[in-house]
Amino acid sequence: MMAVEQMPKKDWYSILGADPSANISDLKQKYQKLILMYHPDKQSTDVPAGTVEECVQKFIEIDQAWKILGNEETKREYDLQRCEDDLRNVGPVDAQVYLEEMSWNEGDHSFYLSCRCGGKYSVSKDEAEEVSLISCDTCSLIIELLHYN
């Protein structure tokens, strides 16, 4: 399995023509439709060589997109990476905070920290292992989550 960090920065959802909120079933339908359309064996014999190569490349991209988005674990990793990339593009990190400095909310099993705006930064126990940036639920501030080694 390929680590998400090593994956090229492609929008696998747009390759499948899908919305990031699409469920696995919808993604599978889009994949199946596209894979049939671009499959090398389904191409007409009178198509120019350059067009055939483009179709093969598209076929490979569609297959890669499905390998990532069709698996719950790799999809989750990819979605988290997309979220972090989006946050990095929003603005600079306001503070660096160690997970151990955050408070624990037993009710929803998450760590949280109050923001200076009155909102809060929160991250679930599972996500805390994987994310490094957390946005405030009220304002645009972002913190970087650190872990003691």
Swiss-Prot record:
Reported effect, residue 23 to D: In a breast cancer sample; somatic mutation
One Gene Ontology cellular component annotation held by this UniProt entry: cytoplasm
Pathway assignment: Protein modification; peptidyl-diphthamide biosynthesis
Localization: Cytoplasm, Cytoskeleton
InterPro entries: DnaJ_domain, DPH_MB_dom, DPH_MB_sf, J_dom_sf
Domain J as annotated: residue spans: 11-82
UniProt keyword Transcription regulation, yes or no: no
MF term (GO), any: ATPase activator activity
CDD domains: DnaJ
Domain DPH-type MB: 93-148
Domain of life, per lineage: Eukaryota
Primary site of residence: cytoplasm
Any one GO biological process: chaperone-mediated protein folding
Chain positions recorded as Zn(2+) binding sites: 115, 117, 136, 139
Keyword NADP: no
PANTHER family: DNAJ HOMOLOG SUBFAMILY C MEMBER 24
Domain notes: The DPH-type metal-binding (MB) domain can bind either zinc or iron ions.
Subunit structure: Monomer and homooligomer. Iron binding promotes oligomerization.
Physiological role: Stimulates the ATPase activity of several Hsp70-type chaperones. This ability is enhanced by iron-binding. The iron-bound form is redox-active and can function as electron carrier. Plays a role in the diphthamide biosynthesis, a post-translational modification of histidine which occurs in translation elongation factor 2 (EEF2) which can be ADP-ribosylated by diphtheria toxin and by Pseudomonas exotoxin A (Eta).
Protein family (similarity comment): Belongs to the DPH4 family.
Descriptive protein name: DnaJ homolog subfamily C member 24
Organism, as annotated: Homo sapiens (Human)
Species lineage: Eukaryota, Metazoa, Chordata, Craniata, Vertebrata
